[in-house]
Amino acid sequence: MALDKVAPIVIVTPFNVMTDRYDEFIEKVRKALAGTAGAKVGPKPKSKVESPVLDKGTFPVEQPPRWIHVELHGKTQGTTTPKPKVAIRSDDAYIMGFTNSTGRWFQLSKTGTTYKLVDDKAVMAGFDGNYNTLVGGVNNLPTLNLNKFSMAQAAAALWNKASTLSGGIGSDVVDDDDGDMLRANDPVKQAVATLAVAVCEAARFSPVSKVVNAGWIKDKVSVTPDEVNYIKEWGDLSTALLSWMDKQYKDDATIFKKFNGIGITNGEEALAVVRLVKLVIRSNMAAAPTTDEQLLAYAQLPKHGRYMAEVFAVRIPATAGGDRPAAPSLCTAATAAATSFTARKKNTPRSKPAATARVTWSSLGHRLATSAYGPIVFNLDLHDGNCGQADEEEDEKNTGRIVCDAIGGDFSNYNKAISETVLTRCGPAEVIYAVLSNGVQGRVDVKLAGLQSRDEVVLVGRIVARSKLFDFGCVLFYNEAAGVRVRPGELVPLARHALAVPLHMPLTIELDIRHGGSGDEIVRGELEFKTAIDGLHTGRLVGVNDAEFEVTILWSEYPW
């Protein structure tokens, strides 16, 4: 994909690795990365330091607001050594590309990626900048030596990347067909990882820059598990700091409670750690990437997920002046892989007529996300109190069926919301679903973690999961009538747990929970989770009177 325009470039004063002061260099990088809006977190004059907020984010496959170029110099034995540049996004402080000895740009993307970001003639490096790809995971960062000699070696490795080109300087082909797979001691991946920590993570976190600076001229210096914990929590720490600022720098105990385990209990302690605040964009605040170019660009992102299907809703149009179906309605979907789920319609009060019936999904048989490695069949058995009971033959006749041949040669509607209507015994029903080309399973649980009273409480409201890739959300919990009874420490009974989620796009869990009967708010807010191919991610949301809900997501790339 041709690059129409490169974002504005900010050039940091070149850094001579062997002679310049590292601490002064990192301050220059922080200054360059500070967002153009000028926002800073820190209650002046009380706070000793203010942390700048980065530029507002764009999609990973789009140009950032600005590029920050850092040029590395060095001298050994009287000769000038490599002067490569690295390109850092201004919205997330991630390295996205680097130059070699000829000045050619290499983009940190898998071989075959068609979209260009750092330069119109950029060559794909053959791997992305994820720590899983670079060093086997963030927990392996302490294995990196971050002293000045290692940083000089990293610069040399980028400079020597020219040797991997085939077909000459004009070629965009890289001899790295398995470049997205981790290879032991790959010098270029090690170099990118070293610079990512010694430059980017050091700019984000004071503890990282202090560790590197203290060991800059020593034989070996590495981050510790303490710094790794900060790196893991950067997004959530940024969100907490922004929330703290919005609340006039009050309510520290509530806002920073989830970080007590890593030694952060209040805003001042968070500011002492975080020097650059990421402006986290919630999924319901940004438009989904629905243009053909955006979807094509998304399809070019590293594919570590699987083909999966996700259903957002089954809509049943109400007849004019009538009531919507009152009895339970079932919808099942299955593929050749024999994965399935069951949906059960939940009724809303008749005093609140609507154009469509609300459908959520029951967990009956729905233990796994739906595979899309075969044709997907949707069976809708909808009935109301007037339809009566039908025998098996009539049930088969009146069951609406939609078949999506996702493995057919002409199927191309990946990563888009698809709407199809089928005739059922109760009239037409619309199914809205998507087939993902790069999906992972997220198994969601929501727990009432804390309440002022240990007594049972009746919960009403809704819990919705929403991916940034789509305008639609998946209803996990919906109850506006009798409510459900839950005690502190117990799980909220969700209608479904297993979701098929697009990789590389954040997943937001939105909670709007109230007391049954009084309708008083218990908690209202949202938690954003970064999608992953494995691992257990946890987030906490604190509501009125210290009511606390814990959301956990267990990620899996191949759940079947």
UniProtKB/Swiss-Prot annotation:
It catalyses: Endohydrolysis of the N-glycosidic bond at one specific adenosine on the 28S rRNA. This is 60 kDa jasmonate-induced protein. Induction: By jasmonate. One of its GO terms (molecular function) is rRNA N-glycosylase activity. Residues 37-56 are annotated as: Disordered. It comes from Hordeum vulgare. Transmembrane segments: none annotated. PROSITE patterns: SHIGA_RICIN (PS00275). Keywords: Hydrolase, Plant defense, Protein synthesis inhibitor, Toxin.
